[in-house]
Amino acid sequence: MSRNSSLQALVLSVRPFGEDNRIVKFLSKEKGIFDAVLYGGPKSKLRAYVSPYHFGNLWIYTDETKHSIKITDFEVIKYHPEIRDNLFKTWCASFCSELVIKTDACGEYEKIWTLANGFLDGISVSSEDECRIAFLRFIWRYIGIMGLQCDTESCLHCGENLTNSKGKIYFSILENGFICENCFNQSNDSFFELSSEAIIFLQAVTLLSPKEARSIPLHFSTTQQLHEFLTFLINRYTGCKLKTLEMSSGIL
């Protein structure tokens, strides 16, 4: 059985298939992550429309017998041209795409659909400095959808409120949780040290609306702390090395 259908989709990646064709990986709320074949050479108008990070209305022809999907048309709603004009924004979008693909959107297609599209929309209209903070929010929210966010409010050992802690705050890699200075074992060499500002930021991203969370400023040193911490976590939780993170030297 074969059928024509339409849906809204985000282009995650495009790769060559044969001499003139391409295999396109999409994300949609209805179908999740799926591949579709785009036929046509370099001069194809449709080929120009179906490019990474474009979002729009997609028409497909599904051949159930051959287990294949063919792209018949694509109406772009959002091009995100600003992403291609900035190296850091391009890197952020590439990271987003790789993470979504390698985790199969955590099986939470509608939630990741909203998060990924919101992230790409946001970095398109933001400054590079704003993008660096948006990148941190994106990872922490993604970890939340994975169901792996640890408690940022209380010490793992004594229950002290970390927001009001006047001492240092540590994340124990072995115990996978935050520990106050009084409970921290100095012999533990597998940890991240975070400022109270970093903890408050993570709490805000979890509890506040995206608009409210965007208004929270960060010092440069805190941004660096969180980048090192969150990229470690996402690599750990995905169970694989993300190539975009490995290639980030010179970009960040």
Give the location of each predicted region:
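Non-catalytic alpha-helical scaffolds and adjoining flexible linkers that form interface surfaces
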Residues: 1-23, 27-252
